[in-house]
Design a protein with these regions (language model features):
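Short, charged/polar connector segments at secondary-structure boundaries
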Residues: 1-138
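Amphipathic, charge-rich alpha-helical segments that serve as recognition/docking helices
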Residues: 82-89, 133-181
Length: 181
């Protein structure tokens, strides 16, 4: 699959943002951004409109020790580099569990993306959605003036944030899927 150009990805995101802003039920999420809260618009865009983040903290160490790291350094948005990143993300803990959860429940939380389609958060979800042959991903879009440093800080903060949701017990899971009348 050929990766669309940065401009093509940006245009896809601009189009989705414009359509979302026209809707009365536009979805927004709060993101801690530049010492304030940003209410970022959530859009559903084609998976082809996003690229995996080669600077992701989740895979940085694995990437540095990979024999194929040079492909990523040389051209992080090439097919080969994106394949390397995908493989590293698949090898992170609990990938199969995440993929199975997406298969069963769909994407519950939006990822975060730059205006040019670089994933800040949801890289692993993107790989899993592609593996499931899904066509779209839900993402909150950052402002166009976001710098690399701000993006890196946000990505680290989002990755380090603890998820306090607890698993359902077996009984509650059954009640959820098979209500008793």
């Amino acid at each position: 699959m050929a990766i669309p150009s940065e401009e093509a990805r940006a245009q896809s995101i601009r189009t989705a943002l414009a359509a979302a802003e026209k809707r009365s039920d536009v979805e927004r999420v709060r993101i801690a951004w530049k010492d304030t809260d940003l209410m970022a618009t959530v859009v559903e865009i084609p998976l082809s409109s996003v690229v995996l983040n080669h600077r992701s903290h989740r895979i940085r160490a694995q990437l540095e020790s990979s024999p194929r790291a040079e492909f990523v350094r040389r051209d992080p948005f090439s097919n080969e580099a994106q394949d390397v990143i995908s493989e590293l993300l698949r090898d992170t803990g609990r990938f199969d569990e995440l993929r199975d959860n997406l298969k069963d429940r769909g994407q519950l939380d939006p990822g975060v993306v730059t205006h040019t389609g670089l994933l800040v958060n949801a890289n692993t979800r993107c790989v899993a959605l592609r593996e499931l042959r899904k066509r779209h991903i839900r993402v909150a879009v950052l402002p166009e003036d976001a710098t690399e440093e701000e993006i890196d800080r946000l990505e680290l903060r989002l990755q380090m944030k603890r998820d306090f949701r607890r698993d359902y017990t077996f009984t509650n899971e059954l009640l959820h899927c098979c209500p008793v009348n």
